């Protein structure tokens, strides 16, 4: 699978840890509540912790990295050369992800987990491995192999392509 533990985000409003994942055909966002984490003990049966919620992510190819900002999960995927995307998934007041009411995707594609619907998408350059928000800015980290790593900084309000040529740095 292409998902990795680098894809983690913490929802401070609902106290939920989100982790990227990959289902049989869909990228996923999986959730564990803080209370579940605090009450979990590996010594009680030697079993991995189970997710409290799992969502198939509609529209995104893979979930390589994610971050939480202002009531939403931003999920992106890593590509070596091609442009990639970041999708924005809204978090409801109860901590669940937004599902478009008229979507009948679960039955159509044969999945049992809920299908979260992205409300917006940003095109980004390849080699992005992480994302953060700071003072109305989007920070993207880019790295691959022995090449120098970099942090690209964009205005948060900017829509469209977040390409290397548009970055402050």
What are these regions (language model features)?
Residues 25-38, 81-98, 146-163:
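Structural motif
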Residues 1, 36-53, 93-116, 158-169:
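Beta-strand initiation motifs
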Residues 17-23, 75-79, 140-145:
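Conserved beta-strand positions in repeat-built beta-propeller and related beta-rich domains
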Residues 2, 54-59, 119-124:
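Surface loop/turn motifs at the tips and blade-to-blade linkers of beta-strand repeat domains
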Residues 60-112:
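Hydrophobic, aromatic-enriched interface-forming segments
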Residues 2-49:
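Long, hydrophobic, well-ordered secondary-structure blocks that form the structural core
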Residues 115-169:
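Loop/turn-rich, solvent-exposed surfaces of beta-rich toroidal or solenoidal domains
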Residues 6-15, 58-75, 79, 124-134:
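Structural signature of eukaryotic scaffold interfaces centered on beta-propeller domains
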């Amino acid at each position: 699978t292409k998902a990795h533990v680098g894809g983690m985000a913490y929802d401070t409003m609902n106290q939920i840890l989100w982790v990227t994942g990959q289902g049989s055909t869909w990228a996923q966002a999986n959730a564990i509540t803080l209370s579940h984490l605090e009450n979990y003990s590996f010594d009680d049966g030697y079993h991995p912790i189970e997710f409290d919620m799992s969502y198939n992510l509609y529209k995104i190819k893979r979930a390589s990295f994610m971050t939480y900002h202002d009531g939403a999960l931003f999920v992106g995927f890593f590509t070596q050369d091609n442009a990639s995307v970041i999708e924005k998934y809204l978090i409801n007041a109860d901590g669940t992800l937004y599902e478009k009411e008229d979507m009948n995707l679960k039955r159509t594609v044969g999945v049992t987990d809920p299908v979260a619907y992205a409300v917006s998408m940003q095109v980004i350059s390849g080699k992005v491995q992480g994302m953060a928000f700071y003072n109305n800015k989007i920070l993207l980290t880019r790295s691959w192999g022995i090449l120098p790593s970099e942090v690209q900084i964009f205005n948060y309000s900017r829509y469209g392509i977040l390409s290397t040529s548009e970055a402050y740095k």
